[in-house]
Amino acid sequence: MTLPRRALLTGLPFLAALALPEPAHATPRGPAVSRASSRPYVSGRGGYAAYRIPALVRTRRGTVLAFAEGRRDGVGDSGDIDVVLRRSTDGGRTWGPLAVVAAGNGNTRGNPAPVLDPRSGDIVLVTCGNAGDVTEAQIMRGEVTAARGRRVYVQRSTDDGRTFTRPRDITDAVKRPGWRWYATGPGHAVALTRGPRSAAGGAPGRLLVPANHSTAPARGSKDTGREARYYAGHALYSDDGGTTWHLGYQATGPAGTVNVNETSATQLPDGRVYFSARDQNGGAPGNRLDSYSSDGGATLDRPYAPQPTLKDVPVVQGSVLQLQGDGAPLLFSGPSVPTARRAMALWSSTDAGRTFTRLATLSDGPAAYSDLVQLGPGTVGVLYETGPYDALEFRRVTGIGGHPPA
């Protein structure tokens, strides 16, 4: 069925954030972190009290799309929340007007997970939502009907992110009966470009969205379902460019030792998918978990396990991105103080995620959620929450993997 198209709603006009004039700064052993930054989203502007939950994708034409949740009532996770977008045609230096991609209309819409479909060139966007007057805690306790609880939606853009189709509900295909909470990403999804599960005949194709959910306690349990051990990970995928969707791997729970929460994914050069997840107060050391899939996200090669070399990361969402190019590293972004959300940093892995090394620190102040996008050889853009959720800041990092700083 062809969905009707609608023009994106533009928010209140405000000036595109301009890059600061200072030159890039390179450490003797690290990449160049540009002192110039832009802020596509500043809380209190554009009709929203706060912006959170960044997600990035680069279109086939090179346009950077920066998605976020526009929260009208404050920084909280429930209430009147829209999925919003700003576009940049100059690598994140300046940004076009704010647009609403998925309007909450008093309800909650969020957890953007965008991806470039390599076959069509379209941008496919998966999001979640629920009634605006319910909370995550109520949903996890089973106090909310399915209609008012977490739902899953897909949209697409065929015009470089200028307009998107209306959200189409795919919940029945990707959410099992009995699951309560449900969240995609947040952050970019993955288009598989190599390996037997890339698509029929080995062509690029499978769209893979990392996600998490919560389950209900066993009958007779004194638990409410709000306990962190009821979180678990899963993935959803499409092999036809986002038309039909299926459930991939589904991690079992409750465990209590590792509690898989917000998850990011990327495809490694050998074709495997690498998953990196937030450990929501599990009993294992550290706050990051990881796993691998050799069949395009349908199953996991092993259960999630702690990632000890990311021990400085607090309990928070993080982003992973395998850079393209011979010998290019796998990157991870997140705060770098284990007991606080501050000091956004980049880590690098040259052994497919077995170990990570701190690559660069982007800022010393408060920082939380982030997402990564490759802008060119050895160059990435990082969109991250900064301040006490004051803004989403975009920074360019160049000179990664031996490339000269730009």
Language model features: what each stretch is:
Residues 3-9:
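N-terminal export leaders
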Residues 12-17:
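Bacterial N-terminal signal peptides
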Residues 2-3, 26:
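Intrinsically disordered, low-complexity regions enriched in serine, threonine, proline
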Residues 4, 21-22, 117, 398:
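Alpha-helix initiation/capping motif
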Residues 18-32:
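C-terminal region of N-terminal signal peptides and the immediate post-cleavage residues
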Residues 30-406:
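Asp-box/BNR beta-propeller blade signature and adjacent active/binding-site loops
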Residues 9-10, 90:
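General helical structural elements
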